Amino acid sequence: MRELFATKTCPYCIEVREQLEWDALDFIEYDVEVDGAARARLRELVGANPMVPVLVEEGRVSQVGVSGRGCYVGNG
């Protein structure tokens, strides 16, 4: 199962979410702005200063940001 770590307002997250939906791919989305456990897992996956969107496939990070761009997640 694909997992998308994102925020509702990040334009890069919106782009990845819309592409996954357009491609009719199943995924679970975690909003790291409101879900502390998801934010902690995101940090485990990509480090202390994570950038979203992060796409995880089969337990492995397959994408961070979009073409090197993304939105940084605060300490929340």
What are these regions (language model features)?
Residues I14, A37, V64-G65:
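Residues that form or flank phosphate/diphosphate-binding pockets in enzymes
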Residues V46-V56:
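Structural micro-motif
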Residues P11, V34, S62:
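Glycine-/small-residue-rich active-site loops that bind phosphorylated ligands and cofactors
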Residues M1-D26:
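Local sequence-structure signature of Cys/Sec-based thiol-disulfide redox active-site neighborhoods
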